[in-house]
UniProtKB/Swiss-Prot annotation:
Signal peptide: none
Enzyme Commission number, as recorded: 3.6.5.3
Chief localization: cytoplasm
Catalytic activity: GTP + H2O = GDP + phosphate + H(+)
Claim: Hydrolase is one of the keywords in the record: yes
Name of this chain's protein: Elongation factor Tu
Top-level lineage group: Bacteria
Chain positions covered by the region annotation G5: 173-175
Pfam families per the UniProt record, alphabetical: GTP_EFTU (PF00009), GTP_EFTU_D2 (PF03144), GTP_EFTU_D3 (PF03143)
Listed CDD domains: EF_Tu, EFTU_II, EFTU_III
Annotated keywords: Cytoplasm, Elongation factor, GTP-binding, Hydrolase, Magnesium, Metal-binding, Nucleotide-binding, Protein biosynthesis
Binding site for Mg(2+): T26
A GO term for molecular function: GTPase activity
Length: 393
């Protein structure tokens, strides 16, 4: 069967299910597709096909993730669900599946559990903009307990700087919805309405300020220096002023030509692989790892806080722990930069498989803002991944 072309008639939003093991994340994902399929807004996916998620590699890390798509009357959603707890941590830290919002699934029978807390914390650390809660298994939970669970959840969300009092908490049973029970199905529709309303529409990459990481540099005799790379966000037109940021002191230039596949363009935009001809820039002044950006929109930094995941030995990571002062390479966008790691107080060492917050100081400044993802490497081999949570200087 030929693939249908993707129609862009509705805003697109990326979401995912998060929460403690066995609280019903995958059942809920299957139930959403089943209920929306009856309205012609999704293809039904059964539990098994979501649960046996294929493995993918992102920044050298293997993650199992199921991708499901569906629509509501207002939006088109790409939804991710991960089989294992470690897959969630890796997914959120590597940004393999950038989430514009998430559905936190909590079993009414158990209430918040350790992974519930950990997923909320991670969602805060990696800046998932909004959460909606599905309180699952309410058909088999004590009604008084459910009220307590709701209060506890709102307090927990507030503790991690989410608007605990305002977040919609939808009560239902994903299993009943999946079995075609009307009450269950109603809770799924309520949930989708809450997701439509409460999770904000993301700013598209093309609407953000222009930024292109430099991958390669050429000089064209008599014309100047060309930086090539894939435009990460925004758009650029000929004769616009740009800044070259990172590694060396920031300097300004003007784009005098934009080339793509040997053709000259008036404008380049997010997603394009382009070459930018820069006025008055010598070939020695531009190098891989710098970025070309709209002036004033990004600055170079050397010190930051990050949330990191360290690969297990079985994932191709280190076989031994590391200690305070560890000096690997940090791979940002297109280049490796050496940096030293300071562990949090009270943490003596980090074992393969751990995730934690660390402070990093790089030997040269790199253009960065909060949420920038990076890989941690040793001699070209990926041993971890991270996300910048706070810039220090």
């Amino acid at each position: 069967m030929a693939k249908e072309s993707y129609k862009r008639d509705k805003p697109h939003v990326n979401i995912g299910t998060i929460g403690h093991v066995d609280h019903g994340k995958t059942t809920l994902t299957a139930a959403i597709t089943s209920v929306l399929a009856k309205q012609g807004l999704a293809q039904q996916r059964d539990f098994g096909s979501i649960d046996k998620a294929p493995e993918e590699r992102e920044r050298g890390i293997t993650i199992s993730t199921a991708h499901v798509e569906y629509q509501t009357k207002k939006r088109h959603y790409a939804h991710i669900d991960c089989p294992g707890h470690a897959d969630y941590i890796k997914n959120m830290i590597t940004g393999a599946a950038q989430m514009d919002g998430a559905i936190l699934v909590v079993a009414g029978t158990d209430g918040p559990m350790p992974q519930t807390r950990e997923h909320i914390l991670l969602a805060r650390q990696v800046n998932v903009p909004a959460l909606v809660v599905y309180l699952n298994k309410v058909d088999i939970a004590d009604p008084e307990l459910i009220e307590l669970v709701e209060l506890e959840l709102r307090e927990l969300l507030t503790e991690y700087n989410f608007p605990g009092d305002d977040i919609p908490i939808i009560k239902g049973s994903a299993l009943k919805a999946l079995d075609g029970d009307l009450e269950g199905e109603k809770s799924i529709m309520e949930l989708m309405d809450a997701v439509d309303e409460f999770i904000p529409e993301p700013l598209r990459d093309i609407d953000k300020p222009f930024l292109m990481p430099v991958e390669d540099v050429f000089s064209i005799s008599g014309r100047g220096t060309v930086g090539t790379g894939r435009i990460e966000r925004g758009r650029i037109k000929i004769n616009e002023e740009v800044e070259i940021v990172g590694i060396k002191p920031t300097r300004k230039s003007v784009v005098t030509g934009i080339e793509m596949f040997q053709k000259l363009l008036d404008e380049g935009q997010a997603g394009d692989n382009a070459g930018l001809l820069l006025r008055g820039v010598d070939k020695t002044e531009l190098e891989r790892g710098m970025v070309i950006a709209k002036p004033g929109t990004i600055k170079p930094h050397t010190k930051f806080k990050a949330e990191v995941y360290i690969l297990r030995k079985e994932e191709g990571g280190r076989h031994t722990p590391f200690f305070n002062g560890y000096r690997p390479q940090f791979y940002f966008r297109t280049t490796d930069v050496t940096g030293s790691v300071t562990l949090p107080e009270g943490v003596e060492m980090v074992m393969p498989g751990d995730n934690l917050s660390v402070d990093v100081e790089l030997i040269v400044p790199i253009a960065m803002d909060e949420n920038l993802r990076f890989a941690i490497r040793e001699g070209g081999r990926t041993v971890g991944a991270g996300s910048v949570t706070k810039i220090i200087e």
